[in-house]
Design a protein with these regions (language model features):
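Structural recognition of an alpha-helix C-terminal capping motif at a helix-to-coil junction
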Residues: 20, 34-41, 55-67
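A short, charge-rich alpha-helical start-of-domain segment used by transcription regulators
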Residues: 1-20, 33
Length: 164
């Protein structure tokens, strides 16, 4: 398979998960789109460099996307509210009161995740996306043996923030 076909295949496979990761990290559609595009531009450039083989494409993409999200957050002061784009996950749950409760719960969880340190936020989002501990370690630079403990601490902080 030539490089262009390989890139296209990986783009199709990973664009949506990377975009969703960036959106949840930044809470901004345009920013998520920009960071996702920049991630794949960097991936394409890396593919075309001589002797730069990427061992784990998925982990590499999440690492670059996470770093670009951090850079984006550092450039801007964030005082915007979370967009009201909550999907109703169950068609059966059409009771307006239940929908409102579900929306509030989702908002509280997103806000609690947003209050985490950026590396912990990235870990939680990667965990939600189903990355292995090894992939999370490669993407964040945290030792694989520390990923579980760091994740549980982040989950505890989320729980504590929700209970407040």
């Amino acid at each position: 398979m030539d490089k262009a076909a390989k890139f296209e295949s990986l783009y199709r496979q990973y664009y949506t998960p990377i975009y969703k990761f960036c959106f949840r990290f930044l809470n901004n559609r345009e920013g998520a789109h920009d960071v996702s595009q920049e991630t794949f531009i960097k991936f394409f450039e890396r593919m075309n460099q001589q002797g730069n083989k990427i061992e784990n494409n998925r982990a590499w993409l999440y690492k670059v996307a996470g770093n670009l999200c951090l850079n984006s957050l550092n450039k801007k002061t964030r005082h915007s509210e979370i967009e009201n784009t909550i999907e109703i996950q169950s068609v059966e749950n059409t009771n307006p009161e239940n929908i409102l409760i579900d929306n509030e719960k989702s908002k509280m969880v997103r806000n609690a995740i947003g209050q985490l340190k950026p590396k912990n936020r990235a870990l939680i989002l990667m965990y939600q996306d189903g990355l292995s501990y090894q992939e999370m370690a490669e993407a964040t630079g945290i030792k694989q043996s520390s990923i579980g403990k760091t994740l549980w601490r982040a989950i505890d902080k989320i729980s504590a923030n929700i209970k407040l």
